[in-house]
Each structure stands twice: as structure tokens, then as C-alpha cells.
From Swiss-Prot:
SUPFAM superfamilies for the chain: ATPase domain of HSP90 chaperone/DNA topoisomerase II/histidine kinase (SSF55874), DNA mismatch repair protein MutL (SSF118116), Ribosomal protein S5 domain 2-like (SSF54211)
UniProt cross-references to Pfam families, sorted A to Z: DNA_mis_repair, HATPase_c_3, MutL_C
CDD domains the UniProt entry points to: HATPase_MutL-MLH-PMS-like, MutL_Trans
The organism of origin for this protein: Pelobacter propionicus (strain DSM 2379 / NBRC 103807 / OttBd1)
Protein name (Swiss-Prot/TrEMBL): DNA mismatch repair protein MutL
One annotated Gene Ontology cellular component of this protein: mismatch repair complex
């Protein structure tokens, strides 16, 4: 016989609500900091112990609460921010449900101390597992202090799902970074077991981004402003060259609230398409302001997801704002210092590829020009027209290079790739070859990446990845989470060829990098590896994650995008491919080559 329906006790409903709002220590900190910001705080201090499992303490200088309000704040759905259902259409605060504090109190031992500015004394309330144990007067500065101890002490099922103290501290750091970027007018500090995780002073947004993400990252950002159709968009976005391997540096805010929204992310990625490699993500700090009635923030317990009333308008306006800035390519030299073509005879290219050509120009011009017959013999190609303006350039189609004569057959047996007859390059990105009645198209970046990965893997399995000390060590300023990862995984980074030395705060000195990557962007490679290590988890799993890290190094060690190759270089690459395992794909799983048969071509041209 089924049990009868009964109303759950309040202590159980509070625990259920806590399961929706309080996922881990970082979510506790998010909810409490939002309350501090709503209370007008301009200085917020966070202290955690054991990643927040043992202690979370938040101190602010906000308006504070009276004795009556402090007690009411521990009741479910008690709030000062809304009074009627009409207020839900005009929410201007970060919190409004009145759920966070009672939910946190129900699964922890909580101590709340608060004092209003004009009050002679404060109020201290001690709560254990949702039950008020003591209420008394206390002496304190104006503001509020909330201490949360032994989170989930009465819900062991939730406690066992928490990660290590270091991992939880990392989540806390990420949360504070998002909050700090949202309010550059507020000072934030955070310590973990007595060690500073974050300390930022009040200032403008660019200064805050420099403090939170590092000066190098901030230097790659470009300011954005647009007002259209009742939507205000402002913030900073990075050049395509400063992109990351994850979305961890994409900070998007709606009316001051950090969100993760597929519509917003899609608009950003659409704007960057064609100027950024696949699988890469820009650094952005974007603030979108629109009337509160145009967005519903009451659709998810964590408020990270929202619903727009005019979704398409928000998407298209944001994409348009980003594209207008990207089209101007502010990271490139201005007209008085025109960008030189990557090589003699380079074709006219669209604005979308201008940045990629400029990045490859220096490396291309530095290549040796010694005669090494047979060389590519190509017909003359049009030069870029400096009169073309951004957005109006057309894409020129290259004329097919005249194929050179094949070499004399080698005495030793050749592998598949070495035996291919080279036709030439297409768009300086793909190698065209012939094998019998087949046209073989090879992605030169994917092939180079596979060869480099094979070398790194062999080095790792024998004497370790070959390292090269830098003649001039680089100083690299990291975000606090990146610095924490570098500290925790120092031994693992050394095994793959890196030497990083602490230099105070979140700054490290790069003394050595893998020899294969010596000519590449060391700082970008290190940031990508730190992001990869953060996602992969504990160092005990390092051997399992070895290939992912080595493939990241391989990707950075070879040419990307448009790059002119001589015949000698192509033959060396093809020979290297014959000596690799899994030569059909790059380490990330993308295909290296594609075959088009003569029969397929004849069908395309209706000759069969």
C-alpha cells in the first residue's frame, strides 16, 4: 500500500533548496558576495580553509542589518528586494529570492554578525543545521561578517561529492574572478589557508582585467562600445592571436550578472569565425545592459542561465558589435605602416585572413632563400591593392602552380607519403599530391603536428622531453588560478620540458621550454597547458593525460594557418609522416589527408 501524502518539515525543505543553490563552497561564496554587493559594499574580504570545506568567512562594509532584519534573513523567502510579482519584471539586484542564507545555514554551522552604520552595536546569530542556537549583541565595525563552518556536516551524501581542497579552492578563485571583473569599483581579497589567492583594488575595468588576468592578457584587449535598439554593449575583447584553448576566459554579464548562455556564446563565436582557428576561444569581458523586462533571470537556481524576450535581437546586436570591431583589426599596423605581404607573389586576401597573414609574415621572410632545386615554379600572382578598404576586399583565386618534375626514384623502398608526387600548395595551407589516379590533399598543419607529437612522445618515453634554456628568460604574469595550477603541477611541467620559477605574486619566470617549441609563443603555450592541466585534474592522473599535454605542445611547435613551404620542406614533412604512428589523423583526431579519385573528379565534371 502506498504511503499517504504529507507536507515535509521545514528543515527538510531547506535542505532540498540547499541542494539547488549550494553545490560546493564556491556557490556559497557566490550567493553571499551577491548579498554583500546588493548591500552596497565597496570592500569584500573572503577567507577559506581546506578549500572552504572547513571554513568560509566573508566580511563586507555594506549597510549591515538590524537585529530584526538579521533574524528575518534566515527565514526562507525573506527578502528586502521585491514586494510583489510585478517586481519580478524589474529586478535590479543580484539576489531576490531570499533562499541563499537559509539554504546555507541548513547544511552548515553558520555565524552571522551584522551592524548598521547608525547602530551602537551589532547582532550575532549562531545557527547549526538550520536551527538558531543563540542571538546576542556584539561589538563590530559597520557591515556584515558571515562565517560558514563544516559545510554539509549533516548531509554526508553531499559531502562525499566535494573534490580535494585544492580543486575546491580553484573553483572559489574562478568564482571570485568573475565577481571581481563584474564590479571594478569594489575591492576584493581572498586568502586560502593563510595564502593570498586574489587581491584587487578599486579602479576601472581595464585595470581590473589586468589585475585578474595578467598584464599580458590585458594588453591584447580592445575596447568595445555599442548602443542600439535599447541594448548597450561595452567591455573588452581580444585579438584572434590571444585566443585560448577553453572558454575559461570568456566573461559575459547581463545587467551586471555573470551568465553562461548559449545564445551569447554563439554570437561571440560567430563574430570570430574566419579569423580564429577552430577549437580556440577569445578572451572577452562583455557587459550587456538591457531593460530588466527584456530578460528573465528567474529560470535557474544559480541564475547563470537567463531567457531573453527578444533572443534574436540580442544575438544579432552582439554579433554585429563584435564584427564591427574585428573588421577594423585594431591589433594590426595602421595605414601609415602597411602590413607587408607574407612573401613575394602572395595573393590578395580578404580582411578575415589579414591577421593570419601578418602573423606568418615574419616567419616566412626569415626563411632561407638558398636555391635548392627543384623549386616551385609558379605563375605571377596579383599583389594586394592598398586602395582596398576593410570589408570590400574580394578573395583572389590562385592560379595553379606549374608542377615540377618528379625526382629520380630512390634506391630504398619508400613509404606511402614519401612516394607521393608533389603537385604544389593550395592557399599555403594544403599540400596537393598525386598517387596514381588519386589526388591526395594534405593538411600541412595537421601533418606537422602529428610528426612533432611523435617526436615528443618518443622523447618523453626515453630520456624526457628535450628542453632548451632561454637566452633571455621571459617574465609571465598569470591569473591567480593559472599561478596556482603552475605551482601544483611544477614537477609535471618539468617532465615535459618547462622550467617555471616563482617570481612573487602570480608572476613566474620561464627559464626553459621544449626545444621543438623554441620558435613559438611560449606564453600562449604555457597558458594553454595550464588550462589543460586544470581540466585534467590531479597530478596522479598525469600519465593518463600525457598525450593531451604533448599534443598541445606539438600544436604550438608547428606552423599554423597560411605558411609557404619549399619543396624540400614538403618532402621532409612527408618523410616524417612515414615514420609516425596513426598518421591518418593529428593528435586531436582531425584528418591529415583526403583522397579524391579520378573517377570522382570525372563525375563532378560529368565526364562519365
Amino acid at each position: 500500500m502506498s504511503q499517504r501524502i504529507a507536507i515535509l518539515p521545514e528543515i527538510i525543505t531547506n535542505k532540498i533548496a540547499a541542494g539547488e543553490v549550494v553545490e560546493r563552497p564556491a556557490s556559497v561564496i557566490k550567493e553571499l558576495i551577491e548579498n554583500s554587493l546588493d548591500a552596497g559594499a565597496t570592500d569584500i574580504s573572503v577567507e577559506i580553509a581546506a578549500g572552504g570545506r572547513r571554513l568560509i568567512r566573508i566580511t563586507d562594509n555594506g549597510h549591515g542589518m538590524s537585529r530584526e532584519d538579521a533574524l528575518l534573513s534566515l527565514e526562507r523567502h525573506a527578502t528586502s528586494k521585491i514586494r510583489s510579482d510585478n517586481d519580478l519584471d524589474g529586478i535590479h539586484t543580484l539576489g531576490f529570492r531570499g533562499e541563499a542564507l537559509p539554504s546555507v545555514a541548513s547544511v552548515s554551522r553558520l555565524r552571522l554578525s551584522s551592524r548598521e552604520t547608525d547602530s551602537p552595536e551589532g547582532t550575532e546569530i549562531i545557527v547549526e543545521g538550520g536551527k538558531v542556537r543563540d542571538v546576542r549583541a556584539c561589538g563590530m565595525a559597520p557591515g556584515t561578517v558571515i562565517s560558514v563552518e563544516q559545510i554539509f556536516f549533516n548531509t554526508p551524501a553531499r559531502l562525499k561529492f566535494l573534490r580535494s581542497a585544492e580543486t575546491e579552492a580553484g573553483h572559489v578563485g574562478d568564482c571570485l574572478t568573475r565577481m571581481a571583473i563584474s564590479r571594478p569599483d569594489v575591492a576584493f581579497s581572498c586568502s586560502s589557508d593563510g595564502r593570498d589567492l586574489l587581491r584587487v583594488q578599486r579602479g576601472d575595468l581595464l585595470r581590473r582585467l589586468s589585475q585578474a588576468l595578467g598584464k599580458g592578457t590585458a594588453a591584447s584587449l580592445h575596447e568595445l562600445h555599442l548602443s542600439r535598439d535599447g541594448i548597450d554593449i561595452s567591455g573588452y575583447i581580444s585579438s584572434p592571436a590571444a585566443c585560448r584553448s577553453t572558454t575559461s576566459a570568456m566573461f559575459t554579464y547581463i545587467n551586471g550578472r555573470f551568465i553562461r548562455d548559449k545564445v551569447i556564446q554563439h554570437a561571440i563565436m560567430q563574430a570570430y569565425r574566419g579569423v580564429m582557428d577552430r577549437g580556440r576561444y577569445p578572451v572577452v569581458a562583455l557587459f550587456i545592459q538591457l531593460p530588466p523586462a527584456e530578460v528573465d533571470v528567474n529560470v535557474h537556481p544559480t541564475k547563470h542561465e537567463v531567457r531573453f524576450r527578444r533572443q534574436s535581437l540580442v544575438h544579432d546586436t552582439l554579433q554585429s558589435a563584435l564584427e564591427e570591431l574585428l573588421k577594423r583589426s585594431p591589433w594590426l599596423p595602421r595605414p601609415q605602416t602597411p602590413v607587408q605581404p607574407a612573401a613575394v607573389g602572395a595573393p590578395s586576401i580578404s580582411q578575415a585572413y589579414r591577421e593570419r597573414v601578418a602573423a606568418a609574415a615574419q616567419a616566412s621572410l626569415a626563411m632561407a632563400r638558398k636555391p635548392d632545386p627543384p623549386r616551385f615554379h609558379e605563375t605571377a600572382r596579383p599583389q594586394p591593392d592598398p586602395r582596398h578598404t576593410p570589408g570590400t576586399e574580394s578573395v583572389s583565386v590562385r592560379e595553379a602552380p606549374t608542377p615540377f618534375l618528379p625526382r629520380e626514384p630512390a634506391a630504398d623502398p619508400q613509404g606511402y607519403f614519401s612516394a607521393l608526387r608533389i603537385i604544389g600548395q593550395f592557399h599555403d595551407e594544403y599540400i596537393l599530391c598525386q598517387s596514381g589516379d588519386q589526388l591526395v590533399i594534405i593538411d600541412q598543419h595537421a601533418a606537422s603536428e602529428r610528426v612533432a607529437f611523435q617526436k615528443l612522445r618518443h622523447q618523453f618515453d626515453t630520456d624526457g622531453v628535450e628542453s632548451q634554456r632561454l637566452l633571455f628568460p621571459e617574465t609571465l604574469e598569470l591569473s591567480f588560478s593559472e599561478a596556482d595550477t603552475a605551482r601544483r603541477f611544477g614537477n609535471e611541467l618539468a617532465r615535459i620540458g618547462f622550467e617555471l620559477e616563482p617570481f612573487g605574486g602570480n608572476t613566474v619566470i620561464v627559464s626553459a621550454i621544449p626545444r621543438l617549441a623554441i620558435a613559438r609563443d611560449a606564453s600562449g603555450l604555457i597558458r594553454d597547458l595550464l588550462a589543460e592541466l586544470t581540466q585534467l585534474g590531479a597530478s596522479s592522473a598525469f600519465l593518463d593525460s600525457r598525450d593531451a599535454l604533448l599534443s598541445r605542445i606539438a600544436c604550438h611547435s608547428v606552423v599554423r594557418g597560411v605558411h609557404r613551404l619549399e619543396e624540400r620542406q614538403i618532402r621532409e614533412l612527408l618523410h616524417g609522416m612515414d615514420g609516425t604512428d596513426f598518421a591518418a589523423s593529428c593528435p586531436h583526431g582531425r584528418p591529415v589527408s583526403h583522397v579524391i579519385t579520378l573517377g570522382e573528379l570525372e563525375r563532378i565534371f560529368k565526364r562519365t
